[in-house]
């Protein structure tokens, strides 16, 4: 009969502690790439939908991860993960 392998990895921190740390890291990254009023609106939407619950925390983590992934994939100027390998050229003279 099959048995699940024993947990032989390092001790993990509690789920809620890890989740809050992940949310904090995502928020810090999101404010570098998206307008604060827009992020505030997203936070208000999540709060109005889920209230102050773990379900709301999980929802905002999921949404921020998706938004950041798409943002980087499309080609964030701060990232090396974009679709096109060449830099985008702007019209007009370059900066001195």
Curated annotation (Swiss-Prot):
Keywords, alphabetical: Activator, AIDS, Apoptosis, Cell cycle, Host G2/M cell cycle arrest by virus, Host nucleus, Host-virus interaction, Ion channel, Ion transport, Modulation of host cell cycle by virus, Phosphoprotein, Transcription, Transcription regulation, Transport, Viral penetration into host nucleus, Virion, Virus entry into host cell
Phosphoserine, modified sites: 79
Source superkingdom: Viruses
A Pfam family that the UniProt record links to this protein: VPR
Listed InterPro entries: RetroV_VpR/X
Post-translational modification: Phosphorylated on several residues by host. These phosphorylations regulate VPR activity for the nuclear import of the HIV-1 pre-integration complex.
Homooligomerization: annotated span: 1-42
Signal peptide residues on this chain, from the entry's feature table: none
GO biological process terms on file: DNA-templated transcription; monoatomic ion transmembrane transport; protein homooligomerization; regulation of DNA-templated transcription; symbiont entry into host cell; symbiont-mediated activation of host apoptosis; symbiont-mediated arrest of host cell cycle during G2/M transition; viral penetration into host nucleus
Subcellular location: Virion; Host nucleus; Host extracellular space
Main subcellular location: virion
Function: During virus replication, may deplete host UNG protein, and incude G2-M cell cycle arrest. Acts by targeting specific host proteins for degradation by the 26S proteasome, through association with the cellular CUL4A-DDB1 E3 ligase complex by direct interaction with host VPRPB/DCAF-1. Cell cycle arrest reportedly occurs within hours of infection and is not blocked by antiviral agents, suggesting that it is initiated by the VPR carried into the virion. Additionally, VPR induces apoptosis in a cell cycle dependent manner suggesting that these two effects are mechanistically linked.
Oligomer status and interactors: Homooligomer, may form homodimer. Interacts with p6-gag region of the Pr55 Gag precursor protein through a (Leu-X-X)4 motif near the C-terminus of the P6gag protein. Interacts with host UNG. May interact with host RAD23A/HHR23A. Interacts with host VPRBP/DCAF1, leading to hijack the CUL4A-RBX1-DDB1-DCAF1/VPRBP complex, mediating ubiquitination of host proteins such as TERT and ZGPAT and arrest of the cell cycle in G2 phase.
Family: Belongs to the HIV-1 VPR protein family.
Misc: HIV-1 lineages are divided in three main groups, M (for Major), O (for Outlier), and N (for New, or Non-M, Non-O). The vast majority of strains found worldwide belong to the group M. Group O seems to be endemic to and largely confined to Cameroon and neighboring countries in West Central Africa, where these viruses represent a small minority of HIV-1 strains. The group N is represented by a limited number of isolates from Cameroonian persons. The group M is further subdivided in 9 clades or subtypes (A to D, F to H, J and K).
Name of the protein described by the UniProt record: Protein Vpr
Source taxonomy: Viruses, Riboviria, Pararnavirae, Artverviricota, Revtraviricetes
Gene name tied to this protein: vpr
